[in-house]
Amino acid sequence: QERAIFGILQQYARSGLFETAYLVDNMIVENFLGDIPVAGYYDGLNDIIVSTFHMINVFENTEPLIGTIQKPQESSRIATIGVASFESGEENLFYPFDLVREKAYYYAINKEKLESDGSLIKKIKTQIKSKMQDNVRVSYGIFPTNYEDDYIFCKAYTSKVQLEKEEEKEENNS
C-alpha cells in the first residue's frame, strides 16, 4: 500500500494536481549526519530537513546578489533537496534520483567574504561548470548571509517517477 501511494503521489505531481512532490530518504539524511543518538534521532533528521527547506524557501523569495535561479520546467515536478560542501563541491541530495533534469544551487556566503574575497566568484563559477553535465539544466544564486560559515543548498528536479529501493531490488533480481 505504501509503495502504491509513493507512486501515486508522484503521478499526481507530474499531472499538475500537486505543484511539486518532494522526496526525502531518512537513511540518506542519517548517513549525511553521521552518528545520531537514539534519544534525538528523529529530531536530528527533522532539523536538517526543515532547516534546508527553510533556507531554500528564504532564498527563493530573495533576489540573489549574482545569478538566477530558474523555475523548473513544467514536466519537472518531482524534487529533492540537499546540501553541498563549499570547499569540495561534494553534493548530498536527500533522495537518490534515477534521472536528474534540473538543479538549482543556493550559495549562502558570509557577507564580509563577499566583499573581500576576489577569487570567490571564480571558485563558484568553476563549481557550477563542473555540475553542467549529462543534459542537466543548472542554475545558481549567490546570497549574502551573516553566518560565519558558508553553505550551499541545492534542489534537484526530475520528471521520472522514482521507484522505492525495494522495487528496484526486485526488478534487478528478475
Model-derived features: where do they sit?
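Tubulin/FtsZ superfamily GTPase core signature
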Residues: Q1-S174
